[in-house]
Amino acid sequence: MLDEGRTLSLNVFLNALEEGYRNERRYCFILGAGASKTSGIPTGEELARQWYGDILERYSREEIKALKKRLGVRRTQPSSRAYFDLYALRFFPDYQNGSAFLERTLERAQPSLGYYPLASLLANTRNNLVITTNFDSLVEDALFIYTDKKPIVISHELLAQYINFNTSRPIIAKLHRGLFFDPLNRAEQVSGLSEQWKDILREAFRRYTPVVVG
């Protein structure tokens, strides 16, 4: 349950953001999977449920038990927390099939209405940074559709060094990589931040106040 003493009404939150911006504070936006749902992209929990059904159809109980032991899988009850374990089971042994599945799932998604104000903020204010674990291209698509600003998209940790926080151009930092850059989808890949991201994020949070969306 949310701590009511730490929960803000929408009006209080927006007023605080507006006043902070007038006082030269910069905000960045941290996007999770929930931000993509209204654009037709399944949540992590919805994908986990789909993969769980596929696994039950493909394997016997004994085979699932053996695979869990081989892959070090701990969670198989479908939930957002089991996303990475169920991905590992569903697409073993060829995880390129997992990448192809995600491409098919995400490629037709279009930015929902909520991406319009986000694109406007990124393009027209100093609040120009998005940090996300999502693979999709909804933020950059919204910028192309609604604004004339081309974003700097960091779709791989090896490109993180090219982020320039002094630019007025929108920056999209994809911590788990972009859809076409072998996205990180297994538990051992996301157990911690890569070294390339750590220094960049420290600097980002010195300059920006994070606002979490989805």
Segments (PLM) and residue ranges:
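Active-site loops and adjacent core secondary-structure elements that bind or stabilize anionic groups
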Residues: G214
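Conserved catalytic-core helix/loop/strand module for nucleotide-ribose chemistry
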Residues: M1-T209
